[in-house]
Every structure is written in C-alpha cells, then in structure tokens.
Amino acid sequence: MVMTDPIADMLTRIRNANMVRHEKLEIPASKLKREIADILKREGFIRDVEFVEDSKQGIIRVFLKYGQNNERVITGLKRISKPGLRVYAKSNEVPRVLNGLGIAIISTSQGVLTDKEARAKQAGGEVLAYVW
C-alpha cells in the first residue's frame, strides 16, 4: 500500500508511542524524516535518535524523553502542511508556536529549520509541523 503522507505517519507514530509511554519506536527512514528527527533531538523533545541501515530504505530509531515523574516532554504534535493543502510562510511571516514555547518545523531552501532558525536566516518555506 502506498503511503500518501509519510511525515504525518512519522508524527502519528511518535504521538502514539508517547501517549502510551514507550521508550523507543522505529520509523521507516527518508532524508526529510531524518532531518525532522535531528531537529526534535536538538530542541530537546526526544532523548536520542539513531539510523539503522537495512536492505531497503533504513530505519530511524527514536528514543522518547520523559520527565522525572514520567510526564511527557512532547505535549503535542500537529501536521500543518498536508498533501491536499500545502502551507507556506514568507520569511517575515514565520509562525510562533505558543509564543515560543513550542517549535515550528519549516522546510526551506537552506534545509529543514526550526522557526527560530528560519527567522534568524530570514528564510521562508513550507511549514511542516508544530511541536510543543
């Protein structure tokens, strides 16, 4: 079966594993998914990420992060730009998520960036997701 929106599938897998407090999960790899996983790690939303090569496309293994009392670090994940309705933002219209408490993941000509990085580089692009 052909997957229509692999980014939404990745976010849904992370959301579901986070809700039942799994320690790790595996996602079929792609370059864009790897960049999104790296951003989530760099911003402190996940504990670790590793890339496992296999005979097909590879696997991204994501290790989820929880607080001291087992509370979730990722409160919410939302796919913004979808295959049926793409959402773009100019460099001066890059959105803020919860007044800076969350991040927007944006695909720009300079790579996949957070909203803060896109503002600093004055780059616009496709708004992939919000994470808070």
UniProtKB/Swiss-Prot annotation:
Keywords: Ribonucleoprotein, Ribosomal protein, RNA-binding, rRNA-binding. GO terms for biological process: translation. The keyword Transmembrane helix does not apply. GO terms for molecular function: rRNA binding; structural constituent of ribosome. GO terms for cellular component: ribonucleoprotein complex; ribosome. Gene3D superfamilies: 3.30.1370.30, 3.30.1490.10. SUPFAM superfamilies: Ribosomal protein S8. One of the primary rRNA binding proteins, it binds directly to 16S rRNA central domain where it helps coordinate assembly of the platform of the 30S subunit. Part of the 30S ribosomal subunit. Contacts proteins S5 and S12. Belongs to the universal ribosomal protein uS8 family. HAMAP family: Ribosomal_uS8_B (MF_01302_B). This is Small ribosomal subunit protein uS8. The gene is rpsH.
